[in-house]
Amino acid sequence: MPALSLQQLQLINFRSYKCLTWDCRPGLNIIFGPNAAGKTNLLEAIGYLALARSFRQQQDQQLLTWGASSFQVRGLCHSNGEKIELVINYQQHNKRLTINGNRNRLIELLGIFPVIYFGPDDLHLLKGGPAYRRHFLDREISMGDRLYCRNLQDYRRILFQRNLLLRAIKAGRGKEGELEPWDIQLLATGKAICEKRSCFLQSLAPRVAATYRDMAGGEELALIYRPGVASQEEWAERLKVGREREVQAGMTLWGPHRDDFTFTLDGHEARYFASQGQQRAIVLALKLAEARYYRELLHVMPVLLLDDVFSELDEAHQGALLELLAGADQAFLTTTEVGLLPARLIQRSHLWELARGREPRLTSGPVEAQ
């Protein structure tokens, strides 16, 4: 299987980094330093190369260094035997992508440099609201499917225009008959989104269940898709009979923008009945399964980004994560204290010390390489 790795990361005015050039190493990389040193910011920048979007923030404006009006993220990657330069520039709500010096649409970035991120906030996949889980679905599916990303963009545009019209009708500036062409577009695009989400979760579900079973034993974990509407026919009917409700609400009340998914343990909702340790294990099982799914789909192992996760896992769950790391071409892990990590992980890793706003400093390499 071809290897995937990031060879060099350059940042200008990104988060706490005014200017950074970091020559990364293949294999395992442990980034250690005190809180607020910028460890998570580095992972965020690496993840930005996958989708031109942050896994922490919805607004690119929030990624700017204080006082700056633009930022740049540049990555020199090695993928499928080729060297690829990815450069993303942001200024005044506009993004520009160049690949090997050529201007490209942002959607062309998808699938070139896939990553899997695992951090403390991922517990929101169980504890948070449906919007958080939809954001996860959209981000992860888009990474391997450009058509899904296009459909999602179209759906959001159609939804926005339809909601404007609903509010105009409520204010007496529009007629209900004007909704019909928007309904047709909404149904067609929404169908494609729902079908892909269902397919993705159906592919992931048995992998997640098997991974959790290996880690936790007897409990049966299920991953269940809960679409905003049961079928296309039901959705079309609701749009017709529920128009008055939608006009009064000034928004579209049914569709994939109301989708959700859930986890159950032995038939019980995990978000309510699972312990904190079980919830961490569920999220870990999801991430492990996702990495293996993308390895099969894209024929390359995604780069793994692990943000201070080992301290929250027991020995059995650490073992499952170490097994995944053993098969990774490249992984980046953060911690405040190297001594908190398993010794066998430290021995196989490059250790990078980080101080706020500075470039990581290599302090040691894998034992095998010395």
From Swiss-Prot:
Keywords from the named record: ATP-binding, Cytoplasm, DNA damage, DNA repair, DNA replication, DNA-binding, Nucleotide-binding, SOS response
InterPro entries xref list: DNA-binding_RecF (IPR001238), DNA-binding_RecF_CS (IPR018078), P-loop_NTPase (IPR027417), RecF/RecN/SMC_N (IPR003395), RecF_2 (IPR042174)
GO biological process, any: DNA replication
Main location (coarse class): cytoplasm
GO cellular component: cytoplasm
Pfam families in the record: SMC_N
Subcellular locations according to the entry: Cytoplasm
Binding site for ATP: G33, P34, N35, A36, A37, G38, K39, T40
Top-rank taxon, per record: Bacteria
GO molecular function: ATP binding; single-stranded DNA binding
Family statement drawn from the similarity comment of this UniProt entry: Belongs to the RecF family.
NCBIfam families to which the protein is assigned, alphabetical: recf
Function: The RecF protein is involved in DNA metabolism; it is required for DNA replication and normal SOS inducibility. RecF binds preferentially to single-stranded, linear DNA. It also seems to bind ATP.
Identification of the protein by name: DNA replication and repair protein RecF
Lineage: Bacteria, Bacillati, Bacillota, Clostridia, Moorellales
